[in-house]
Amino acid sequence: EHEQQEMCEAVGGCFADLMAGKYIINVLEPKCWDDGGDPDDTAAPEAFRKSTLLAQHVSFLKDFFRAYKDFSDAHIDTIEIMVSKLYAQWGITERTNFRRMRPEDYPILSDLYDLIEEEFKRYDPNAHLLYTEKLLQEVLLGLHSMCKGADAQFFNGHTNITSSRFLVFGVKGMLSAAKNVRNAMLFNVLSFMSDKLLTVGN
């Protein structure tokens, strides 16, 4: 019932109603899932076993996109290749100092969509790529709502949470949201909270 909103705003906190579309957590902004990945820990999720922040985040993105849409392994592998290309275009690598990055320094989902669309338009069947033209088309169809369409208001944009010191997420409206949107939004919130706990604390 958003009973915490007035108190949160009174002390200078941020009340983020997830369904209002005002506040966004950029899913393409790398988040910290573990402060020391162990590749030999087979009981841990894949993202936790990666040793670098970017590798952890790309692994998280694979699960995030699965939560949003029933993509096949081939679709997810294609998205992973496209995400890696996008980060390379933006100069984001394993050696990037993420502590110096601002929210505006990261690509957003519409940038990813534009990249995939360009790859689709320029597809060369003689180039022997790892992905097919049909896969690109299906990925574009599956991601359109999140990147450009009705769901973009919840996912497409730079992170604009005004305070992580006192932050309340309003989830009431999510009860009536489509299951795939709800799952993806909660997954995204979890990544944001994990990152703040591991990098900032409190």
Residue ranges: model-predicted function:
Residues 4-5:
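Rossmann-like S-adenosyl-L-methionine
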Residues 9-14, 18, 23-202:
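P-loop NTPase motor domains
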